[in-house]
Amino acid sequence: MISASIPFRSRLSGRFRLANFLSLLLLLALLLTACRDRRATPVAVATDAAQPAPVAATSAVATLPAPTARASAPTSEQPSSPTSSPTSPPASPTPPPPATAVPPAPASPLEQAAYLHSIGEYGQEQRLLNTLLADPQTSFGRQQETPAASLEQQRSAILYRLALSHLASEQPARALNALDQFRLLGEFLPVDDSSASPSAHEIALFTINSDFLRAEALAGVGRSAEAVIAYRTFLEERPQVAGIVEEIIADTWLAVGERSQAANALREAANYAATAREKVRLLERLAGVLEGMGRWDEATAVYDQIIAAAGSEQEEPDLVAADLDQPDSDYDDILGYREWPIFLVSYLYRAGIAYAAAGDEDAAIAHWRKALAEEPASDAAYLSLVQLVNRNAPVDLFLRGEIDLFAKAYIPAISAFERFIAESPDDARAGEAWLGIARAQIGLGQWTAARLSIDQVLDNYPDCACLGSAWLARAQLATAEGAPAAGRRIYRTFARERPDDPLAPQALWLSALSAIEADAHLDVSAAHHVDVPVEPFDEAVADLLRLTDAFPDSQQAAAALSVAGIGAFAHGRYAQAANNFARLRSHHPNAQPHAAAYWLGRSRHAQGEVDTARALWQELAASAPETYYGVLAGLEAGAALPGRDFVPRMGAFAAAVPALPGDDGSRAFAEDWLRTLEDPPQDLPAAALDAVEGDTQWDLPHAVADDPDFAGGELLIQTGRRAEGLRLLEQAYWRYRDDPAALYPLMLRFDALGANRLSISAAYHLIKLSPTGKVAGAPIFLQRIAYPRHYASLVESEAAAVEIDPLLLYSLIFQESLFEPPARSFAGAQGLTQIIPSTGAEIAQRLNYPNYSVDRLSLPSVNIRFGAYYLRWVRDFAHSNDVAALVGYNAGPGNANVWFDRTAPDEALFIELLPYDETRLYLQRILTHYYHYARIYTR
């Protein structure tokens, strides 16, 4: 039993129990220090999120609340998979009237139709197009200086767009009817071109593309054989998209059960794959089709191709995160952009299954053995082990125990390790085997047996590399048995007696974590009556400072100072906090420099050293103006009460940032500025610079225009296959991204195509290539593409309807989806504002939205309205505070209220103590996006 102690206090809000938050923050920081790869989560307490790289969030909108407006403890809501919420919402905001879908004026009728198509208002678009069919001249205006296009050309253009609209709204029969009329009109089109729009040249392109639309419509009505003929007719004119279309043909055959034909098409598609990942994806589909037909011999050959292709995957760029220039970026699977890693171990397992089904047991066993060696800590390795054991194939007993332990098959793991020790008592791995037994016993809840197994390691294997792990396991076991104080003593004893062990710093880290967690279990009412020598927080601080003193070069040292600093600040111990942050800056200058500077300033300010604090913030704002902490520092430099009202204060602060001298926001100014950039390195594929005589410098270079991926991607987007088109455009982007002469016109073309994520990425990277490297140091024209206002009519009207700041809504959309309408998260959230389907259904009910279905969440006109309504709802629920509203949008409104209550009105501390690393980064990034939107659009 441990004695109770006086609970933690905070001068910010009376009795403030910090334990739950700091324990999770410690754990997150510990996990970070153990995982130094590019996808590692940042240090939890004082993240230094570099901004403003375009980042797609992995978050999902929380379930629409319906419980009490004041929860007493955090709910089980998670940022990616919310499960609960408050039970009694405040009065819902009055449902706003639906926004009128009107494009920015002036616009021709055809431009209006294109706008309606872009926001998903297909019904309105079709009504407008049908009206134009009755009077085609209205589509181009009745009074023109140039000769009018022929009525046949105008009707053809309208019918083509009508077919696209019907396909987008899943009305293939109507699309087919429009295409039949389009084909009939083709017989009457003039041979010569015209200066009016659409030109005969455009109609000729429409005619070629109409074969693809016809194929799509035929497939939609079940006429698969005719559809395939139409697809192949299209490929005769557009061979650059053969790989994509062959897969579409395969899907067409599969829809009617023609698996053999589908397999042939998938083979063709794989032959056209441009990357190893794409080839593997297609071959995996092919293998599945062959397995379904029982053609196991062919399936084995395909798996061998997959395994061979996987070897080249490491040489390819990561198309998901490498564009961000920051290692802590984590992309969501935005449709059309996600590139999945190749998990070789799973293909080795599946190849083994195929070989076994084909009757080649030796080859099957060989593949399963390779799976065990490839990645023991994987499901595929465990499944491979099961296959080997079922066939009585010999397997190293130690490896068998490890794999069983990874798979939580604890009893088989114990059996394997015990047999290993019995058969090989002198093996160098015997100590590790005993530790494996102990871990399995802990998994089974067999505490006494686990303690005896750990003692075997500590007593009999002093030279085992696993000794440090055994010490940690012994301490963790003591905590699991209900004696956390004893566990902390074990951690400290280990760190003191074996300071050279690599795990010694981690032992002190875990001891500090345990001390903080201990406070969560105290009886607050009884705590004052118990004589406690040391408060848990003081105990934790002692561990953290000992860690930094004894192990200054350890991975945990900087994080320990950060945790100690934030904890001290939250407790009102500002001098102690200042000392910790000053040490962090001086001893670990590269660890968290911006966070340390900001919080040192906050600590000094709280001590009354206002001038010192402002000097720190001014220096930080000047050196890192576009990082989260740099933005906060700029805000705080003139604030009487720092840490508060970030959103209301942001506009005036950001608008004061000057633009480049003479910058009028024009494209011409931007292009003059671009001419000052240095020439690209000579070793780049700068075929983009081969513009022919007569071209302007910033036209799309011929090498790019003729690039098969660019041409094919543009074509697929124009014919309604957005996801496939974006995949190809992504390849072209990566090919020319480091060549400004190519990247700038590519950016413009991406923007015109509505490839929003790519245009944002191109603009951002173009700015990074410039000498300034800062968004605010680039021309406003480029800044507006890097931070766009896509769907402005909808965003502005819906924000006004629910009385929220439209720039905050733009910032949220930027973070959630990078303005990609079909974006989807792992949690199932969809669309521009990432609405979870269940939340969408409840919003639809509250708004009396007719004919709601999950598919409509991908339509901008629906999603923006729902997102704006929900953000306002959460804001009303979360004390009408914008920062708390954003937390509630990501992690659940119940959680947001509880967390904000404990730090209010300090928004900076609120964000710093968020227990979900994802939510903290989400807030930091949105606030930085908001800074840029306010700076660019409130001048």
Please identify what each model-predicted range represents.
Residues 855-856, 878-885:
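Short, charged, surface-exposed loops that flank catalytic or proteolytic processing sites
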Residues 31, 35-815, 819-827, 833, ...:
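Acidic, polar-rich low-complexity tracts and alpha-helical solenoid repeat scaffolds
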Residues 1-16:
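N-terminal secretory signal peptides that target proteins for export/translocation
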Residues 913, 924, 929-939:
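Gram-negative outer-membrane assembly/targeting C-terminal domains
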Residues 22-31:
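Bacterial N-terminal signal peptides
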